[in-house]
């Protein structure tokens, strides 16, 4: 595995240097100003500097060289023994999830019958049977007559506003006069309402 990675790194460095090496030719051995002591290094283009010549032919040649290098990499990778090649990621699910219930809980929870247990609110005192410990549900959850009204209140009573909402000022609608069922009729001549 280590030899394989060394091979690919060496091949990638060789192809990159051969592609980029063609663009950094120093002509006639002349130094280029401030970069005269850095002949062998290339630091990339300066930001904001635009090239005077637009050469699509050079870019096309560089692209073809990169494609050729990638093709060579694939060829030599296919020549490697099968054990040294990378395995494809598995697409199948091989791990099964096994459900384990929590301790103390059985799957047949509904089949259990619970016994009535007497509740003593304080130690040493028991309530008599004729006096319930808590108020009945009807007493506890009985709604006020104001809440039974089917229409919702538009103002919160805690703000001190208890007036009924009317759609227009000075006009009270009587909802008793409105029909329970509304008849919807379609036009016979296929006109559309806007």
Swiss-Prot record:
InterPro entries named in the record: PBAN (IPR008730), Pyrokinin_CS (IPR001484)
Cellular component terms (Gene Ontology): extracellular region
Subcellular location: Secreted
Propeptide: 51-94, 172-194
Keyword Cell wall biogenesis/degradation: no
Any single biological process term in GO: response to pheromone
Highest taxon, organism lineage: Eukaryota
PROSITE patterns: PYROKININ (PS00539)
Leader sequence residues: 1-23
Additional remarks: Juvenile hormone seems to allow PBAN release, which then induces pheromone biosynthesis. PBAN is produced independent of the photoperiod. The circadian rhythm in pheromone production is due to the circadian rhythm of PBAN release.
Function statement: A hormone that controls sex pheromone production in females and pheromone responsiveness in male. Also mediates visceral muscle contractile activity (myotropic activity).
Protein name: PBAN-type neuropeptides
